Amino acid sequence: MQEIVGYLVKNPEVLDEVMKGRASLLNIDKDQLKSIVDAFGGLQIYTNGNWVPS
């Protein structure tokens, strides 16, 4: 799970596609996906990797 979160932090465009339902994460069940999306939902991530609370 940590590798997936790290990848999404480094590649925010992928996170955006996942959150919009246009991409999926392999080997992640729907409960795990919901946890990931919920965790990132309160954050705004810029392409340079800086996290800014929304």
From Swiss-Prot:
Upper taxonomic lineage: Bacteria, Bacillati, Bacillota, Bacilli, Bacillales
General remark: The DNA sequences encoding ComQ, ComX and the N-terminal two-thirds of ComP show a striking polymorphism, which determines the specificity of the quorum-sensing system in the different pherotypes of Bacillus. In ComX, the sole conserved residue is the modified tryptophan essential for the activity.
Entries under InterPro entries matching the protein: Competence_ComX_Bacillus (IPR009233)
Principal subcellular localization: secreted
Annotated protein name in UniProt: ComX pheromone
BP GO terms, sorted: establishment of competence for transformation
Keywords: Competence, Lipoprotein, Pheromone, Prenylation, Secreted
3'-geranyl-2',N2-cyclotryptophan lipid sites: 51
